Amino acid sequence: MSASFDRYVSFQHCDWEGRSERVMQRLQRHVEAAENPFWAYFAQKRAELRDKQGLDDLRILHNYLPTLRELLEDNGDLETLEMLEDLEANLM
């Protein structure tokens, strides 16, 4: 089998990359605020998973979904939480 497999073929017209990036941009504010040690860990793991394993932001968000949801709720960041839940419901 020489053709590569695109696991996101069904998301072709859903702008999953743009939507994931917008969530990551909003999460960056939490990373920079450094109010919880998880955020530094998350930023480090994101870089590692992207660089070493080639994972995209949608997959990384999926990997940390329960923790992200809890922290966003605790921080009252309901807009980012809503964006994350939309990704989960429609693309994960």
From Swiss-Prot:
Record NCBIfam families: N2Fix_CO_CowN (NF033689)
Family: Belongs to the CowN family.
Stated name of the protein: N(2)-fixation sustaining protein CowN
InterPro entries reported for this sequence: CowN (IPR024899)
Organism (species): Rhodopseudomonas palustris (strain TIE-1)
Gene Ontology biological process: nitrogen fixation
Function recorded in the entry: Is required to sustain N(2)-dependent growth in the presence of low levels of carbon monoxide (CO). Probably acts by protecting the N(2) fixation ability of the nitrogenase complex, which is inactivated in the presence of CO.
Keywords per UniProt: Nitrogen fixation
